[in-house]
Amino acid sequence: ESTSHMFVTGPNVIKSVTHEEIDMEGLGGAAVHGETSGVSHFTSETEPDCIVGIKKLLSFLPQNNLEPPPFIEPDDDPEREDDRLDRVVPDHPEKPYNMLDVIETVVDDGDFFEVHKAYAQNLIVGFARLGGHSVGIVAQQPMVLAGCLDIASSLKGARFVRFCDA
């Protein structure tokens, strides 16, 4: 955030053509591409945070297309039962709930690495492990737009599925 920008032409050209004043952050900063355009999959406050995120992402991916993703033995019991699942989803179908609570209850060690967290928030995509195996997760988020899919969330989901299938 505040150190990286993406745009075709800078603020000076925008000002000379449209007479609008805009700074680099507003034109193509982390918030613009992480929340609005969806060009950025991740944003980080600092470079060290970014490196931690990159390492986490790579822990779910194979070294190449001929190898399986890394297997990491989970610390939790694969036969575990969790009463939270009985309480997360409300009895009334019109009441929203947070799908992240469901995901984090089901996946190994409650560890879910969300991709495009701030973009098209009515759809959740990310990586986790089940039984030590890396999986991609796509889930509607009832807390945002009642989980209804729109163009942005559909593109987000399709893009993530293609990435997982590569």
Question: How would you name each of these model-derived features?
Answer:
Residues 10-11, 30-38, 77-85, 136-141:
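Short acidic (Asp/Glu) and glycine-rich catalytic loops that position anionic groups and cofactors
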Residues 2-4, 74-75, 132-133:
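Short hydrophobic/aromatic-rich motifs at helix boundaries and adjacent loops
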Residues 29-31, 73-75, 166:
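Short C-terminal domain-edge/linker segments immediately following a structured domain
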Residues 94-166:
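Non-catalytic terminal/interface segments that mediate subunit docking, oligomerization
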Residues 16-21, 38-45, 88-97, 142-149:
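Short, exposed beta-strand "edge-strand" segments with a Pro/Gly-rich flavor and a Y/T-containing core
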Residues 42-103:
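Terminal amphipathic helices with adjacent charged low-complexity linkers/tails
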Residues 1-66:
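Conserved catalytic cores of soluble enzyme domains
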